[in-house]
Amino acid sequence: MAMVTGGWGGPGGDTNGVDKAGGYPRAAEDDSASPPGAASDAEPGDEERPGLQVDCVVCGDKSSGKHYGVFTCEGCKSFFKRSIRRNLSYTCRSNRDCQIDQHHRNQCQYCRLKKCFRVGMRKEAVQRGRIPHSLPGAVAASSGSPPGSALAAVASGGDLFPGQPVSELIAQLLRAEPYPAAAGRFGAGGGAAGAVLGIDNVCELAARLLFSTVEWARHAPFFPELPVADQVALLRLSWSELFVLNAAQAALPLHTAPLLAAAGLHAAPMAAERAVAFMDQVRAFQEQVDKLGRLQVDSAEYGCLKAIALFTPDACGLSDPAHVESLQEKAQVALTEYVRAQYPSQPQRFGRLLLRLPALRAVPASLISQLFFMRLVGKTPIETLIRDMLLSGSTFNWPYGSGQ
């Protein structure tokens, strides 16, 4: 049996949202009585050949044709269509591995929808949201427009391209962004494009980026509803990855010399071996920022990547790691569908984006603290500041101020 609520379902397996309404489970709807003569969603040319018995790949009942990419019965076709069109999410009452066959298909809607996605039913093929084979040109970097300008309408609730609304999750992530306005301000603060920032500018912009990181998280979808202890745990674990993503998104003009000066290395020389290791880490940081820049990641993709990094179920002390994992999966599904729709000529793009996340973890949080915040906070742990920023909200005062 499964609870049901409005939300984002997704094709990544266990991607159905957790019921936040806390309501009682609805009686499972029996789709076996779906009228065979109902409006057909079968794909042209995919009907069964006469005399050929094909079973539904979801429940094993006799299929009525190919629906949304695979052969299914009328019941599973109708269930999938209803789930997608109504934007339903389900919750499994068992272990998310319920048996789905002709006799048990109505007992757990969560596992039934999960199996629909697993066998290849395509969410985008549901007629209301069918994605055309050719789409307008990609936004932001691909179109040559200024970063974020093509997404301004989305951030205010508009569509990214005619007839193809961006998912509500991405729209909310964009509304939570302190960019693109902040990105322009950071760039302007450093003078002409490509100019080398001084030590004070590096520290000031780093403070703004960290403050913006926490502000983004505070307004990100689902995050405010989590227990405060969970919010702190998630940010303490992911802040360094979010910082690197924000540095790349803001196109922060970083160069080695001011970074080393900001870290205080000129004033306190270190042993040769340690200096070499430190320089390797500095180069690793700059390399990650550069790679994100070369990928020309747009604002929607940055929002999804940051949500995936933020909702890490491995954080210590979480009250419900499975729920956090489901939120991470929602962001991953949103990124999958967005990239598939927006960049159809780049089939490897999603994989390349996702591979950036484990690479970001190779940049130690201690390195970022020493590079950017040593002059600002001394030996105070950044994690302590993040907790204070999260709990204080916009009333938190940096030495440099977040609004300068």
Curated annotation (Swiss-Prot):
Parts forming coiled coils: none
Ranges of compositional bias, category Gly residues: 1-15
InterPro entries: NHR-like_dom_sf (IPR035500), Nucl_hrmn_rcpt_lig-bd (IPR000536), Nuclear_hormone_rcpt_NR2 (IPR050274), Nuclear_hrmn_rcpt (IPR001723), Znf_hrmn_rcpt (IPR001628), Znf_NHR/GATA (IPR013088)
Region (Disordered): 1-49
Tissue expression profile of the protein: Expressed in heart, placenta, liver, skeletal muscle, kidney and pancreas.
Disulfide bond sites: none
All copies of domain NR LBD, residue ranges: 165-393
Positions carrying Phosphoserine: 34, 40, 83
Biased composition (Low complexity): 33-42
Purpose of the protein: Transcription factor predominantly involved in transcriptional repression. Binds to promoter/enhancer response elements that contain the imperfect 5'-AGGTCA-3' direct or inverted repeats with various spacings which are also recognized by other nuclear hormone receptors. Involved in modulation of hormonal responses. Represses transcriptional activity of the lutropin-choriogonadotropic hormone receptor/LHCGR gene, the renin/REN gene and the oxytocin-neurophysin/OXT gene.
Protein's name according to its UniProt entry: Nuclear receptor subfamily 2 group F member 6
Native source species: Homo sapiens (Human)
Gene: NR2F6
